[in-house]
A protein has these predicted regions:
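A short glycine-rich, His/Asp/Glu-containing loop-to-beta-strand
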Residues: 9-45, 51-52
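Structural motif
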Residues: 15, 54, 61-63, 70, ...
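Short, conserved beta-strand element in jelly-roll/cupin
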Residues: 33-37, 47-65, 102-104
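Acidic/histidine-enriched, glycine/proline-rich intrinsically disordered or flexible terminal extensions
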Residues: 114-146
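Ligand-binding loop in jelly-roll beta-barrel domains
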Residues: 63, 83-110
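Short beta-strand segments
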Residues: 43-45, 66-71
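Short acidic-glycine-tyrosine-enriched beta hairpin
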Residues: 8-9, 68-86
Length: 146
């Protein structure tokens, strides 16, 4: 898969591009890049017990809240989210931000994001069906904190 053929998955203002899927790494890791525009407040606080998530800031600044503690992650900064930690992120800053996410083992893939995108798109600009998003999350190993 090359940069010119990478699928961009859009969930409202959020854009996700997988660089490496779990199937390509023998299940050891999945890696995706994501963009969050200024002022965006996403996603639902959640946890996952089956994998760790490491965030590497590429541009701009995102504020990640992990187990109630907010941390700004900017270019070149790293945040490790352990299994079971409740977390979420937002971009309350004036500039767009992007980051790289590394998931180990690589069990979270693009299907999760496609399904969430479908639920958000079905809302046609209105608020998405929170119960439907929760169902998608649980099906892919995420536990909503709501």
């Amino acid at each position: 898969m090359t940069a010119t053929t990478r699928e961009e998955i859009r969930i409202g203002p959020l854009a996700i591009r997988f660089l490496l899927e779990g199937e390509q790494s023998g299940g050891s890791v999945s890696v995706f890049e994501f963009d969050v525009p200024a002022g965006a407040n996403v996603p639902v606080a959640h946890s996952h017990d089956a994998y760790e998530e490491t965030i590497y800031g590429l541009s701009g600044v995102m504020t990640w809240t992990v187990d109630g503690v907010p941390t700004d992650v900017g270019p070149g900064e790293v945040l490790c989210i352990r299994r079971g930690a409740v977390h979420r992120f937002e971009n309350g800053h004036d500039a767009d931000a992007s980051a790289l996410a590394v998931v180990t083992p690589g069990i979270l893939g693009p299907d999760y994001f496609r399904e969430v995108a479908d639920v958000v798109a079905a809302a046609a600009g209105g608020p998405p069906d929170v119960a439907a998003i929760g169902e998608v999350m649980r099906r892919h190993g995420l536990t909503p904190a709501v």
